[in-house]
Every structure is written in C-alpha cells, then in structure tokens.
Curated annotation (Swiss-Prot):
SMART domains according to UniProt: Semialdhyde_dh
Entry annotated with the keyword NAD: yes
Lineage: Bacteria, Pseudomonadati, Pseudomonadota, Betaproteobacteria, Burkholderiales
Family under the similarity heading: Belongs to the acetaldehyde dehydrogenase family.
Transmembrane domains' residue ranges: none
Pfam families: AcetDehyd-dimer (PF09290), Semialdhyde_dh (PF01118)
GO biological process: catabolic process
Binding, NAD(+): S12, G13, N14, I15, S163, A164, G165, P166, G167, T168, R169, A170, N171, N289
UniProt keyword annotations, A-Z: Aromatic hydrocarbons catabolism, NAD, Oxidoreductase
Descriptive protein name: Acetaldehyde dehydrogenase
A GO molecular function held by the record: acetaldehyde dehydrogenase (acetylating) activity
C-alpha cells in the first residue's frame, strides 16, 4: 500500500468540508487526520466525526493538543486571511517543518497555481492558493503570456451568492488585491485587475469568469491553441472547468492609456469566457468557485507529498 502523509484542515465551513471529502475519496499521498473548527455545532465537525476523523472545536490550539498532531505533515487553512497569519505562527512554533497550504488570501507564502507554477514550490513550507477567481483565470492569462507579452489583464469572477460563506464575504478586499497581484506574479501580466461579483440569482448559477488581456500583437491561432491546452491541463483536476465559447480577438490600433502601464498601448485584445461546474462532492454543482479551490489545494499538496515521500525513500 502506498504510504500517505497525514493532513489536518483548519476551518470546518464549506471549503474545509468539501476538501475533507475530496481527501477521503481521492487522496493518494495525503490522508485525512483531523478537522479543526471553532463552532462545536458546525456541520463540518459533525460530518468529520461521523467519518472517523479526529476533531476539535478549539482552533489551532486544540489541534496541537490532539494526539494525532505528532503525525501530521500538512495543514490546509480554510479560515480567513487574518486568521491564517496567526495560525501559521502557532503551527510553526509547535512544528517548524510543517507544510501549510493556505486557501485564504493571506499570501504569506508564494502564490501557487498548479498548472502554471506548481512544480516551482514543492519544497515551500507555506504556499498560497490565491483565490477561486485566481485559480480559474490566471491559467488563461498565463496561456496568453506564453505566446505574447501581456501588458494588462483584467478578470471578472461571478459566483453564486449562496456559495459565498462568511469567510469569503469577509475577505472581498483581500480577494481583489491578492488576485490582482497573482495575475502579475504568476500570470505574467505587467498590470492586473480583479473584480468579484456575487450573483443572487435563483436558482443559483455556476461560476462564470471573464478574462481580458491586452498583449503585443501575436498569432491569434497560437493564442487560441495555448488557451485550449491550458484548459485541458486544468480539467485534469477540475473536470467541470471549460470554455464557454471560442476565444475572441480584437485588434487595438488606437493608443490606449492604462495607469501604471503606459500611455500609448496598442496590440491584441483577447477575451476568454469560462464556466466552472463543481464536482458536487459536498457542495452543490453551482459552487464551482469552491470546488476549484479545494481541487487545486489537494493537487498541490499531493505533488508536495509525492516529493517528500520520494526524498524520504532516497534518504533511507
């Protein structure tokens, strides 16, 4: 049997519970060991207990006191940006070498988009999964960037209001700031901008994302092909990720002024329209925004664990 590394999840809300179900069903190198919350009556903690997972409602302090903590190598943090800073400090003091996968916009560690730069951070002690909008759209910005220099990229992430829990709502500013920075740092754009829309429609609509880039003039077919290859790569761990329609192009011949970028920009505008349907492991299918976050987090941790296990085998 393949050896697996034990993991804990901090945050027993929508994201944490969905991630737990994914690990229990699909974990190859990661084993679900503990669920951490602060509400003793939360559905996530109750569900974890029924599934035989160790639980605590006393936060990170409670996790550290659990007997299983001695065996835990990974912690997924699905709380909030502010809480993650404190959680990282407490865990690092208790176990300096523990790996944290941050599903909040705190961004203590490097930004990680599995299909773009996941392999660059396999040895990092803390990696940041950016945001749901970032996980959905930054691969598209990167797909354009590998064909032509991107001066500016703007993304609009539309999610069902019902899929946005208190953690998401408390982090709106951090969402836009972290996503914009990651569009630049990981996506390769000179300047990035992010907008989130919470759609109150009933019945709830699945996640939809729009990506606009302004790049140097380039071969449109090459960009379209690059986008399609990137979509296929994301679908390897998020099957519900897909293009809503063909990539659209517009030649910009009149100079544009983009603050922070330049005053006389011309080039190629690329418009990419996406939708993300969730796998419905715990949450409804319309919550593709949460599904892509938990899927990306597990993908990242699996690759990190695989590296750790391989290194341990070599050392032995």
């Amino acid at each position: 049997m393949t050896r697996r590394l034990k993991a804990a999840i901090i945050g027993s809300g929508n994201i944490g519970t969905d991630l737990m179900i994914k690990i229990l069903r699909h974990g190859k190198h990661i084993d679900m060991a503990a669920m951490v919350g602060i509400d003793p009556k939360s559905d996530g903690l109750a569900r974890a207990a029924r599934l035989g997972v160790a639980t605590t409602y006393e936060g990170v302090a409670g996790l550290i006191r659990l007997p299983v903590f001695a065996d835990i190598d990974f912690v997924f943090d699905a709380t909030s940006a502010g809480a993650h800073v404190e959680n990282d400090a407490l865990l690092r003091a208790a176990k300096p070498g523990i790996r944290l996968v941050d599903l909040t916009p705190a961004a203590i560690g490097p930004y990680c988009i599995p299909v773009v730069n996941g392999d660059a951070h396999l040895d990092a002690l803390n990696v940041n999964m950016v945001t749901c909008g970032g996980q959905a759209t930054i691969p598209m910005v990167a797909a354009v960037s590998r064909v032509a220099r991107v001066h500016y990229a703007e993304i609009v992430a539309s999610i069902a209001s019902k899929s946005a829990g208190p953690g998401t709502r408390a982090n709106i500013d951090e969402f836009t700031e972290t996503t914009a920075k990651a569009i630049e740092a990981v996506g390769g754009a000179t300047k990035g901008k992010a907008i989130i829309v919470m759609n109150p429609a009933e019945p709830p609509l699945i996640m939809r994302d729009t990506v606009y880039t302004l790049s140097q003039p380039a071969d449109e077919e090459a960009i379209a092909e690059s986008v399609e290859r990137m979509v296929a790569a994301v679908q390897a761990y998020v099957p519900g990720y897909r293009l809503k329609q063909k990539v659209q192009f517009d030649r910009i011949d009149s100079p544009l002024r983009i603050p922070g970028v330049g005053d006389a920009l011309k080039g190629l505008k690329t418009s990419i329209f996406l939708e993300v349907e969730g796998a419905a492991h715990y949450l409804p299918a319309y919550a593709g925004n949460l599904d892509i976050m938990t899927s990306a987090a597990l993908r990242t941790a699996e690759h990190m664990a695989q590296r750790m296990l391989a290194d341990a085998t070599v050392s032995a």
